Amino acid sequence: MAIIDNLGQNAKKASFLLAQLGTEAKNTALLKVAEALLAELPYILEENAKDVALAQEHGISAIMVDRLRLDEKRLQDIASGVRDVAALGDPIGQVVRGYTNMVGLKIIQKRVPLGVIAMIFESRPNVSVDAFSLAFKTGNAIILRGGRDAICSNTALVNVIRRTLASFGLDENAVQLVEDTSHEVAKELMAAVDYVDVLIPRGGARLIQTVKKEAKVPVIETGVGNVHIYVDEFADLDMASKIVVNAKTQRPSVCNAAEGLLVHEKVASDFLPKLEAAINQIHPVEFRADDRAQKILKNAQPASQEDYATEFLDYIISVKIVNSLGEAIDWINTYTSHHSESIITRDIQAAERFQDEVDAAAVYVNASTRFTDGFVFGLGAEIGISTQKLHARGPMGLEALTSTKFYINGKGQIRE
């Protein structure tokens, strides 16, 4: 526990200092971090290249390597994201409500930092910076534990941030990286109840399940996206095709990409050939289909029950033909990861029923699921997309990283 004890003690101390830091000071520091990331671009890209080369040596898929890779454009986007967070309103100190009670006590409920956030995540180095910027803006210290495949990139990014904070006389331990990527140390972080106020895992199903099983600290579950699109009998089929192509092929390695397709039986014979032709013009996609869909599609593999429950993160999609809207809703609620789901329909009642009855953080009508994102939702950068109902749900922006505290002022009142 020596590693985690040291990180935890540092983070706890830093969190008390951060909680007292004013909005202007936080924003100034964030803007300087954004500048430093661009100034240190050669160093960061050199370290990232080491991770990419090692990943390629180990035969990691091109899609997963893409998640890992940084270039000048992506680093500019990361720095821009930090500036965007600096421009957002500061939720800390906001009054949720205030009133005077029956005995004259003035009671104010305000937003305050959570304290120490721990984050365990995979592959994407940008998460290090996004998570730091959101935690810092909300007065929280953060302990980051990335994957082995991104250790050089994460180390470089965190080093740049820490040096920048120190140059401003701020506690560099506002952000710390767990450099030991072993499962044993990760398990210690999951059990650090004396230091960690909340743990946020961000990655694939295996990581999420491991954290849920082994964590002793509070957890906000994020990330896994077994996302469906249902093409209703009253859908505009051209619109539906365009949406499915986008949701599946634009960036298949992300959690808001479509993984399952449900099609009403009345439009399946018209829609599936249209979709197959359109999608293959963009990128070949493997269809894993039920018996009825296999008879319509030119190239489809039989789907297993496991396929219907899988987040592929690849150019693969499961396909099922359903008899009714109700069957589609039941199917989705059986297999969903509670992330994002979409219906394509011109029937207003069907759309409303779908949105009311489907159990997911984001439920769309006539739009791609690729929009489930903190920036798109106007929240700024996100620390993750919560697929649970407590303490936050959906894209987690600044407000999700706060708690509340009651401030009570009296004039000598006692309870009788």
From Swiss-Prot:
Sorted UniProt keywords: Amino-acid biosynthesis, Cytoplasm, NADP, Oxidoreductase, Proline biosynthesis
One of the GO BP terms on file: L-proline biosynthetic process
UniProt GO cellular component terms: cytoplasm
Subcellular location field: Cytoplasm
Gene name for this UniProt entry: proA
UniProt keyword Amino-acid biosynthesis, yes or no: yes
A Pfam family hit: Aldedh
Catalytic reaction annotation: L-glutamate 5-semialdehyde + phosphate + NADP(+) = L-glutamyl 5-phosphate + NADPH + H(+)
Native source species: Streptococcus mutans serotype c (strain ATCC 700610 / UA159)
Protein name: Gamma-glutamyl phosphate reductase
Function: Catalyzes the NADPH-dependent reduction of L-glutamate 5-phosphate into L-glutamate 5-semialdehyde and phosphate. The product spontaneously undergoes cyclization to form 1-pyrroline-5-carboxylate.
